Amino acid sequence: MPVSLHLHDTRGLAVANAHAGLKMGVSQFDSTVGGLGGCPFAGQPKAAGNICTEELVLLCEEMGIDTGVDLDALIEVGRMAEEIVGHQLPGELIHAGSLDAFRRRAAA
């Protein structure tokens, strides 16, 4: 039976919790591009959205788990989402870029 996790990043621990989940065999995660979302109706008006899809993909790829996702293209989608909503999203990779992009620049 597949186990899934639904993680928010309110305290900055979503990636760490996803890492622990992956090591325990979790195979499905709820995530959002750029970390969209939140939970203001639950009494936390500054609650963060779900774990960022792009950060989850990066974690998987760095752990040797093939996702089949083009991370650079996904980061661009996150940047587009930020433009559409009209404010900065909490996702780190949409601002920093992927490790592969960094490695390509460093090797050039």
Name each model-derived stretch:
Residues 1-108:
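Catalytic cores and adjacent flexible loops of soluble metabolic enzymes
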